[in-house]
Amino acid sequence: MARWGGQAHPAMRVPSPSVREAASMYGTAVAVFLVILVAALQGSAPPESPFPYRIPLDPEGILELSWNVSYVQETVHFQLLVRELKAGVLFGMSDRGELENADLVVLWTDGDSAYFGDAWSDQKGQIHLDAQQDYQLLRAQRTREGLSLLFKRPFGTCDPKDYLIEDGTVHLVYGILEEPFQSLEAINVSSLQTGLQRVQLLKPNISIPALPSDMRTMEIRAPDVLVPGQETTYWCYITELPDGFSRHHIVMYEPIVTEGNEALVHHMEVFQCAAEFESFPHFSGPCDSKMKPERLNYCRHVLAAWALGAKAFYYPEEAGLAFGGPGSSRFLRLEVHYHNPLMIKGRRDSSGIRLYYTATLRRFDAGIMELGLVYTPVMAIPPRETAFVLTGYCTDKCTQMALPPSGIHIFASQLHTHLTGRKVVTVLARDGREKEVVNRDDHYSPHFQEIRMLKKVVSVHPGDVLITSCTYNTGDRKLATVGGFGILEEMCVNYVHYYPLTQLELCKSAVDPGFLQKYFHLVNRFNSEEVCTCPQASVPEQFASVPWNSFNRQVLKALYSFAPISMHCNKSSAVRFQGEWNLQPLPEIISKLEEPTRHCPASQGQSPAGPTMVSIGGGKG
């Protein structure tokens, strides 16, 4: 008979004689697992390496996920720790974190026996056993902390009911079963306590570079913040470097998360303030507070960024990020995103980021360059669109003028949109042909942004083109969404981290404003409703008056695909490189990259035909 823990369901408390003896020995201690898997269904042993990545799944910390990645086997090994299991648990993945149409693995009991099986949910949330069992249970055992489940899953399975594990963001889902179910098909996710967590599962397999012997550390931490009892808080804190702090290179950084707050701290960033201001007012409070000094908006140069699930970030051995010294601001802004769905009150936090730096400057300064779209309302997404694409260009003319003859090397990337962004990709093109992807996230979420190290350094030569495309979903909006700085406006940016440092800080584009006005005139001509084209009307006002029928949508989409662009090929001083940058033709691309083909694992036939029955006995808690 299956028994799950101190909160076991009543139907599961009638012990067999052996369990009754165990119960008499251990009293009311938390029940534990000694799992014996059917020998024929035992999988191969997990990799010897530990599980380097770990995140809490739920805000209470009941479920904790660890994992490692084998690129050779194209397999992820998961270790799920369940601290207070009642009658079962489900775990899985879905396109955007929804529990419907999800790829799941479920541990459940019918009150007598326990089962582990690959499953999926339909559009109504009903769970079904998958005909192809691709999650393979390797071990289940008791630990001092709770039940530990070890299982594996290939990246791709060629099962239409399974999620394809790719580079980029993965939306993990979970659910807690509080009572037995006679069958898996009796479970509907709507009746469960559920949630989601975002993470990058396929971390790059990069060797750690050698660190300098004179390396020192600096901690940029929140000053014992009383975390507000609300779901979302962005906390801003201004600090400063010591007087006379000379020029150094940051060579790595890592998160510092206050113990017990692992499920609260969602992501953190350290920004350097603009050197043009001699001082910045000290501040510690919510970033959206009316008390926040306006000057803090000039602290936007990213030094470090961390998100849940990320480990330490290392710069390449030959490069470091410069900070301190002449021409560099002493003032830093720490921003911490607290995700507190349980509205916990009274929790204090001192989380932050630890910088590792050296006075022995490396061969190259690292730099950060902005790719994508200029922050301007001329780039807009019509309402009620589910997959509208906008594209920004860093043209061959700009890279030819601004990059050194030997080019630059991109080693990391941070993608960025506002609330309607769903996909982001940057592609490098050379001689009219797309050559390689710089960074891609087909499941991008604006609520999960981190600097990601690239699996392979991308070299950009003078004359190359960098094309950044963002896909948006405005299905719940009634008006057009225009580009801009506001959270309800949109952005399309890739902050690429590269070396050696150049003067080129921003390489972005937008449609030529004059051609956009021709669009508004065309809309006037072919629609009974008039769109204001008078000079005093702003572009957002003009977009707000467009009747969004199919014709107007298609014409706008076409305009963005052929109209000339205004290029921003800017130095760090925000001044453009010398040249003519308006009315520039779109880069001509004669050959595009092929979409990757799905690989079906050869070991597919070894998977069990049905769920694994788990035989359970008692043990000491």
Describe the residue ranges of each PLM region.
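Noncatalytic modules at the cell exterior or secretory-pathway interfaces
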Residues: 148, 250-251, 320-339, 458-473
